[in-house]
């Protein structure tokens, strides 16, 4: 990190715990992304609601919330938890400009609230993805005492590319967050961002009315 900072590069690590956030601040990070386990891809153990305020209280650099955010409600909630901003992933995978395979986008749009699964916990590399023939087979494989870590890792090698590039429904790892069930359509990035910002602004402006 020192080399990057000396070069004038802003370093904003993704963290899944208070301890790691503090460590990153000590190392000179410009900000941290507090990512809850609702996120797609590699995840930690704490959810966003619990993680973000604890990290906000523990560090003196900006905190960006991530995990389970796909609309203005999530943005407003994150700001109320103390975050300076948000990082979104799943909702932008279905943006018109995103170059992933259409099968990937369509699977996210079709997903329900319970359609994700976390695999890789056994070997310390938990990943959240959509439930597919591949992810179910991976989960079953890692639960077997007769299968080694090397065999499991070999089974999963290249699976993200098979999803994102090839659109392989059976062999691809379609990483996505639990918020996938809230993503209902493929839209331009501009529309996604503007709708999130507008909804968040309305909610925050009207928040005091909920206390009356």
Where are these predicted regions, by residue range?
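Conserved active-site-proximal phosphate/metal-binding subdomains
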Residues: 50-64, 70-212
